[in-house]
């Protein structure tokens, strides 16, 4: 199965343009499926993939309390894999063609209030003033994620040449290998300048290549490290929800809309293929308006 998964991974990367994060999730789902298959029908290989077996696998995860959004992704992983396997001649019929994708409940994302975002960014800036290159980098991670609303995988994938410092623009490669240009403001520019002039030169090695953000050993920063940076920074803010990079992305989108930004402009900045995805943030702002109204209006 390992050889098959390696081929499928190459297909996801080269033909579908899937990110490393997505590919890792898909392969993890398939390894879970194959382990389930080996337990139920040892030695059957891909031929053991049937619609009832796939439904049993999903049902086992559902019974274990797996979130509906995760079940939806696992279903998508399997459907993508089996369709590919049919085209490759690895299996005859597609057992997942009639497998229903569970609809994920669309919940309002946790976001920072604007004052909480300011406190988190000020804490990161204060920590960087000592000149430690990792602290300088961490300030840039938090500042740039909030300033631009880009995904953490997009941030960590940036090269130095993807930054136009004169016009304060990022050239971002998003999902499906779609490229977009995203502006950033003066605070992010200050954090970037400090990193390029002080932090990055202190960490760079022969292995750094063109990567903009580096880890402690000089290699390209891993998104998991960036997530840790965000969690640690935000956790120091009193009363703030426990959020990671995606929470900063949610916060940036929400605060843009609260400031009067056009929905389609926010869609372009975030790299959403569907306006419906961006519209989720309008519900956050409406929910906040309702909460303020209920608290402040004498006849609420």
Swiss-Prot record:
It comes from the Bacteria. Residues 107-294 form the Tyr recombinase domain. The keyword DNA-binding applies. GO terms for cellular component: cytoplasm. Disulfide bonds: none annotated. The active site is at residues 151, 175, 246, 249, 272, 281. It is found in: Cytoplasm. Its main location: cytoplasm. Residues 1-86 form the Core-binding (CB) domain. Keywords: Cell cycle, Cell division, Chromosome partition, Cytoplasm, DNA integration, DNA recombination, DNA-binding. CDD domains: INT_XerDC_C. One of its GO terms (molecular function) is tyrosine-based site-specific recombinase activity. One of its GO terms (biological process) is DNA transposition. Pfam families: Phage_int_SAM_1 (PF02899), Phage_integrase (PF00589). Forms a cyclic heterotetrameric complex composed of two molecules of XerC and two molecules of XerD. Site-specific tyrosine recombinase, which acts by catalyzing the cutting and rejoining of the recombining DNA molecules. The XerC-XerD complex is essential to convert dimers of the bacterial chromosome into monomers to permit their segregation at cell division. It also contributes to the segregational stability of plasmids. Belongs to the 'phage' integrase family. XerC subfamily. This is Tyrosine recombinase XerC.
């Amino acid at each position: 199965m390992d050889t098959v998964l390696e081929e499928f991974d190459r297909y996801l990367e080269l033909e579908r343009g899937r990110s490393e994060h997505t590919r890792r999730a898909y392969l993890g789902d398939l390894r879970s499926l194959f382990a389930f298959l080996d337990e139920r029908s040892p030695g059957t290989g891909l031929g053991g993939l049937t619609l009832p077996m796939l439904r049993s696998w999903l049902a086992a995860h559902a019974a274990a309390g797996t979130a509906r959004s995760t079940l939806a992704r696992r279903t998508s992983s399997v459907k993508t894999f089996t369709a590919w396997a049919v085209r490759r001649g690895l299996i005859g019929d597609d057992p997942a063609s009639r497998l229903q994708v569970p609809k994920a409940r669309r919940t309002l994302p946790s976001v920072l209030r604007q004052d909480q975002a300011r406190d988190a960014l000020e804490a990161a800036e204060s920590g960087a003033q000592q000149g430690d290159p990792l602290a300088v980098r961490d300030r840039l991670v938090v500042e740039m994620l909030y300033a631009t609303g880009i995904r953490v995988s997009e941030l960590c994938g940036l090269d130095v040449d993807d930054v136009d410092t004169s016009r304060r623009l990022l050239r971002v490669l998003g999902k499906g290998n779609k490229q977009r240009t995203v502006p950033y403001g003066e605070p992010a520019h200050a954090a970037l300048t400090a990193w390029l002039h002080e932090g990055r030169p202190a960490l760079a090695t022969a292995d750094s290549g063109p990567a903009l953000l580096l880890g402690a050993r000089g290699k390209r920063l891993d998104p998991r490290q960036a997530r840790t940076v965000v969690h640690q920074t935000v956790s120091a803010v009193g009363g703030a929800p426990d959020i990671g990079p995606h929470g900063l992305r949610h916060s940036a989108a929400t605060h843009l809309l609260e400031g009067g930004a056009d929905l389609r402009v926010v869609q372009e900045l975030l790299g959403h293929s569907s306006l419906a995805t961006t519209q989720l943030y309008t519900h956050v702002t409406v929910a906040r308006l309702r909460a303020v109204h209920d608290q402040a209006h004498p006849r609420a």
